[in-house]
């Protein structure tokens, strides 16, 4: 598989119509990955050993981040957590593996669990440091907080958290109209914005937005060149 986001790879990706859905600002007509460009870029820029993605309709985000990590010299891995509650798409482990491999991505490890279940496993305890966390599970304030608190303590010093569906409060019908619930991730993000040791940026793209989060250095007075790669230029 060639490195980078080639036109051929994007064409193969968008042969799956569901990979154009769920608010990532994609568009097939001009092979536009929307926020997928950002997900890939962060994977390439941070170069993490490990990224965690919580929730995905058909795998757009884990695919974009895993493609980036696979293209890096460091050959990182994506841990993808999704219990397949919306439908049966993620239930068959062999089918899931074949699906990702069909798109040339071989570094996604899927766990068909909720975050609440995953944190009780030996796999969770063995994770170590994480460079990138993407939160897109049940879109409630409470679940977003649980997901964040489960992984934020493992974040690398220059790691990032991305929270999807973070700017709009509205009904969420992903489980069907009869099981609609209130999307409220924004309320958790609003609380995070009150923490002076966090830096957050809202990106108003897609249907419901994305928020980037990084932890500020606890030694805020030190020279920034101490942590920038290679010092001043």
What spans do the regions from the language model cover?
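Class I SAM-dependent methyltransferase Rossmann-like catalytic core
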Residues: 14-45
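S-adenosylmethionine/decaboxylated-SAM
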Residues: 25, 40-233
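N-terminal, positively charged/glycine-rich alpha-helical extensions of SAM-dependent methyltransferases
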Residues: 1-19
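Intrinsically disordered, low-complexity regions enriched in Ser/Pro/Gly/Gln/His and often acidic
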Residues: 1-2, 30, 220
């Amino acid at each position: 598989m060639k490195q980078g986001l080639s036109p051929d790879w994007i064409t193969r990706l968008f042969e799956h119509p569901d990979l154009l859905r769920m608010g990532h600002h994609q568009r097939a007509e001009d092979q536009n990955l929307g926020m997928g460009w950002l997900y890939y870029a962060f994977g390439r820029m941070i170069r993490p050993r490990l990224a965690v993605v919580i929730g995905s309709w058909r795998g757009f985000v884990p695919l974009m981040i895993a493609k980036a990590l696979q293209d890096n010299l460091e050959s990182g891995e994506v841990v993808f957590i999704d219990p397949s509650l919306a439908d049966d798409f993620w239930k068959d482990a062999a089918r899931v593996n074949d699906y990702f491999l069909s798109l040339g991505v071989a570094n996604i490890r899927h766990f068909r669990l909720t975050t609440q279940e995953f944190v009780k496993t030996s796999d969770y305890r063995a994770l170590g440091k994480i460079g990138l966390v993407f939160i897109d599970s049940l879109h409630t304030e409470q679940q977003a907080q649980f997901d964040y608190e489960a992984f934020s303590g493992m974040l690398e010093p220059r790691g990032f958290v991305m929270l999807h569906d973070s700017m709009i409060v509205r009904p969420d019908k992903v489980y069907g109209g009869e099981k609609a619930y209130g999307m409220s991730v924004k309320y958790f993000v609003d609380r995070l914005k009150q923490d002076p040791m966090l830096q957050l940026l809202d990106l108003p793209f897609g249907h419901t937005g994305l928020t980037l989060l990084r932890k500020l250095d606890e030694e805020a007075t030190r020279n920034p060149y101490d942590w920038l790669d290679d010092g001043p230029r």
